[in-house]
């Protein structure tokens, strides 16, 4: 069953922000999903001068 675990990436290692119950050596799959604020900051200005409502519509359509 999938679990969502927030983590911080430091020095080449993903460090969970809460306790995880895995046996040592367990293999897991990590899906990277950037924070919305980071995504918006990265693409700030791409749309030119867009209305707030217009940007909210785009945000609703975006799937990461």
Curated annotation (Swiss-Prot):
InterPro entries: AF2212-like, AF2212-like_dom_sf. Keywords: Toxin-antitoxin system. Gene3D superfamilies: AF2212/PG0164-like (4.10.1150.10). It holds the Pfam family AF2212-like. It comes from the Archaea. Belongs to the UPF0165 family. Possibly the antitoxin component of a type II toxin-antitoxin (TA) system. Its cognate toxin is VapC5 (Potential). This is Putative antitoxin VapB5. It comes from Archaeoglobus fulgidus (strain ATCC 49558 / DSM 4304 / JCM 9628 / NBRC 100126 / VC-16).
């Amino acid at each position: 069953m999938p679990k969502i675990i927030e983590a911080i990436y430091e020095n080449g290692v993903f460090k969970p922000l809460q306790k995880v119950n895995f046996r040592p050596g367990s293999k897991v799959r990590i899906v990277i999903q950037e924070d919305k604020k980071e995504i918006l900051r990265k693409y700030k200005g791409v749309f030119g001068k867009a209305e707030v409502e217009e940007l909210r519509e785009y945000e609703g359509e975006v799937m990461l």
